[in-house]
Design a protein with these regions (language model features):
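Phosphate-recognition beta-domain surfaces
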Residues: 195
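The feature captures the ABC ATPase H-loop/switch
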Residues: 117
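N-terminal beta1-alpha1 cap of cysteine-dependent amidohydrolase-like domains
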Residues: 1-111, 121-129, 133-171, 178, ...
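Active-site-proximal beta-strand elements of phosphoester/diester hydrolases
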Residues: 217-220
Length: 254
């Protein structure tokens, strides 16, 4: 049996929560299981690791960085807007932005999902639509909280893959496919540092990658949901882990 301790070490950013009145940081099982099934070893990254001296010690130990989805939203002031964000998680913002900047500099692979994509957009100088529901010309991209979870994560709309990017290289035989949709915010302005990898039928950005980086991919949908059952989701996670293995080999050559 393969020794999981030999697998690429994937740092997973945690999310703020409360448990019986205590400040807590959590991760949902589906995000962790998707990494394990793809051949990675996930480790939880608490927000205190944003402290620069700790982050500097942490980064050489990571072979990849994984930014999962979350009920929280990125604070508006980080992309130049005013107003409060009732569902903010400042600790996650601080750690995610620091990790993204460090990973881009050190060429550490990144896989970002939902909120993670939005963090990638903001960290590279872009901005977000804060309330998609106020734009009637758009599809409904939020989940229905009254439905069972299995139905909330069911395919909701198609995405069209842009040619010539990372996503089309991972999925060369699949230029469009159906995805789930569980988000109320979205990329608004995308930095020139990013390539738009896919769009929904209403034109919204559904995937981005960082130009001139070996693997820094963000997707707006949730491929972690039952990832081992869907070939397209498996390909994305396995592509991420393969990139992490290449990063290990590159570190060993230096």
């Amino acid at each position: 049996m393969e020794n999981i301790m030999n697998n690429p070490v994937i740092g997973v950013v945690m999310c703020r929560n409360r448990l019986k009145g205590h400040a807590t940081q959590t991760l949902q099982e589906k995000y962790l299981n998707a990494i394990i099934h793809a051949g990675g070893l996930p480790i939880a990254l608490p927000h205190a690791l944003a402290e620069p001296s700790l982050l500097e010690q942490l980064l050489p130990k990571l072979d990849g960085i994984y930014l999962p989805g979350s009920p929280s939203n990125v604070q508006p002031h980080l992309y130049g807007e005013n107003g409060d964000e009732p569902d903010a998680d400042p600790g996650r913002d601080l750690l995610s932005m620091a990790l993204i900047n460090a990973a881009l500099e050190r060429r550490i692979p990144i896989f970002a999902i939902c909120r993670g994509l939005q963090e990638l957009v903001v960290a590279t100088g872009g901005s977000l639509h804060r309330k998609l529901c106020e734009q009637p010309e758009l599809l409904e991209h939020r989940e229905d909280p009254e439905l069972p979870v299995e139905q909330q994560y069911a395919p909701s709309h198609e995405v069209q893959v842009e040619e010539g990017g990372l996503l089309s290289a991972l999925l060369p035989e699949c230029s469009n496919f159906w995805v789930n949709s569980l988000h109320g915010q979205e990329a608004k302005v995308v930095s020139p540092r990013l390539r738009v990898e896919a769009r929904s039928p209403d034109g919204l950005v559904e995937a981005v990658s960082v130009i001139n980086h070996p693997f820094a991919l963000g997707v707006q949908w949730h491929p972690e949901w039952n990832s081992s059952e869907y070939a397209l989701s498996r390909i994305l996670f396995e592509g991420f882990i393969t990139a992490c293995q290449h990063h290990i080999a590159e570190k060993q050559r230096l």
